[in-house]
Amino acid sequence: MMSFVSLLLVGILFHATQAEQLTKCEVFRELKDLKGYGGVSLPEWVCTTFHTSGYDTQAIVQNNDSTEYGLFQINNKIWCKDDQNPHSSDICNISCDKFLDDDLTDDIMCVKKILDKVGINYWLAHKALCSEKLDQWLCEKL
């Protein structure tokens, strides 16, 4: 009985940790509200988020003086606030940990502000890896 409970717990924990790792098609569907916004296509977003966070909604990257959060790797120096950077400009008026859940609504709202202020080049992966040959980033299962 104890081994069954252990296996059940491992299964639940494994599933819970996998929940934030999205697939290409899930990202394609989730980001439909960004289609064409700022002149950026959905395949460009799918490519950019893959190279930025690996489709991981809980990705956190610590830099020397800042941290980037979530699927879009939104920075705490300018766009959101956290304990590490209490003097953030917080342009998106949001706590950075909100970018670590599976609800991408607030992430997308902030992404639109980033696009309006600085454009797609905020995401370095876009220009280097996601501005051409985008067929591989399409999802046929819509």
Curated annotation (Swiss-Prot):
Single GO biological process annotation from the record: defense response to Gram-negative bacterium
InterPro entries named among the record's database cross-references: Glyco_hydro_22 (IPR001916), Glyco_hydro_22_CS (IPR019799), Lactalbumin (IPR000545), Lysozyme-like_dom_sf (IPR023346)
SMART domains for the chain: LYZ1
Tissue: Mammary gland specific. Secreted in milk.
Signal peptide per UniProt: 1-19
Disulfide cysteine pairs (residue numbers): 25-139, 47-130, 80-96, 92-110
Binding site residues for Ca(2+): 98, 101, 103, 106-107
One GO cellular component term noted in the UniProt record for this chain: extracellular region
GO molecular function: calcium ion binding; lactose synthase activity; lysozyme activity
Glycosylation sites per record: 64, 93
Cellular compartment(s): Secreted
Pfam family, any one: Lys
CDD domains: LYZ_LA (cd16898)
Subunit structure and binding partners: Lactose synthase (LS) is a heterodimer of a catalytic component, beta1,4-galactosyltransferase (beta4Gal-T1) and a regulatory component, alpha-lactalbumin (LA).
Family: Belongs to the glycosyl hydrolase 22 family.
Protein's name in the database: Alpha-lactalbumin
Species whose genome carries this gene: Bos mutus grunniens
